[in-house]
UniProtKB/Swiss-Prot annotation:
Recorded GO MF terms: protein transmembrane transporter activity
Amino acid composition bias (Polar residues), ranges on this chain: 77-86
Upper lineage: Bacteria, Pseudomonadati, Pseudomonadota, Alphaproteobacteria, Hyphomicrobiales
Name of the protein this chain belongs to: Sec-independent protein translocase protein TatB
Organism: Nitrobacter hamburgensis (strain DSM 10229 / NCIMB 13809 / X14)
UniProt subunit comment: The Tat system comprises two distinct complexes: a TatABC complex, containing multiple copies of TatA, TatB and TatC subunits, and a separate TatA complex, containing only TatA subunits. Substrates initially bind to the TatABC complex, which probably triggers association of the separate TatA complex to form the active translocon.
Compositional bias ranges of the Low complexity kind: 155-165
Key words of the record: Cell inner membrane, Cell membrane, Membrane, Protein transport, Translocation, Transmembrane, Transmembrane helix, Transport
Membrane topology: Single-pass membrane protein
Length: 178
């Protein structure tokens, strides 16, 4: 605490023994020990009060941030949020209504469809709205044509390979030569 070494402590003890005397030295040491104890207790009490005040300040800050989060999330309950979203979307379209042509739809569906689905430029056929690439058009044309089997493919039989009359010895020579 005071950074006193052993040599300094011996010097202080010798000076105290000479100045105070051997009779009164034990009483003085007892009194110095009591003062040191009181000083330590006061320091510990001060440190405890300081730590307690810091904990209270931290707890108050945590409580404040918790209250802010709770206030921010109070209106966002999961059911409340989903209800607001579904109410804003309205009723989903029925599958039967989607399959019907536009002329057979009820007037309410037509107004909703015209507001959401129809482009501003007028009515465009779905096929004309999306241009097809050459490969898509070719694939559709080929898929719609029936397959025709021509006579040249009906009777086609594989021709046998021409037979060679080489001996195995000649085949080995040819293989080595190449």
């Amino acid at each position: 605490m005071f950074d006193i070494g052993w040599s300094e402590l011996v010097v202080i003890a010798v000076v105290a023994l000479i100045a105070i005397g051997p009779k009164e030295l034990p009483g003085v040491l007892r009194m110095v020990g009591q003062w040191m104890g009181k000083a330590r207790r006061m320091a510990a009490e001060f440190q405890g009060q300081f730590n307690e005040a810091m904990r209270e300040a931290d707890m108050a800050e945590l409580k404040k941030s918790f209250d802010e989060v709770r206030d921010a999330t109070s209106g966002l309950t999961s059911g409340n949020l989903m209800t607001k979203l579904t109410d804003s979307l309205g009723e989903p379209p029925k599958l039967e209504d989607l399959d019907k042509p536009a002329a057979n739809r009820p007037a309410a569906d037509m107004s909703a469809a015209s507001a959401n689905d129809v482009p501003a430029s007028g009515s465009i056929a779905p096929e004309a709205a999306i241009p097809k690439t050459g490969t898509e058009a070719d694939a559709k044309a080929l898929a719609s044509e029936p397959l025709a089997i021509t006579p040249e493919f009906q009777h086609a039989t594989p021709e046998p390979a021409p037979a060679t009359h080489e001996t195995p010895h000649e085949a080995v020579k040819d293989a080595k030569a190449s």
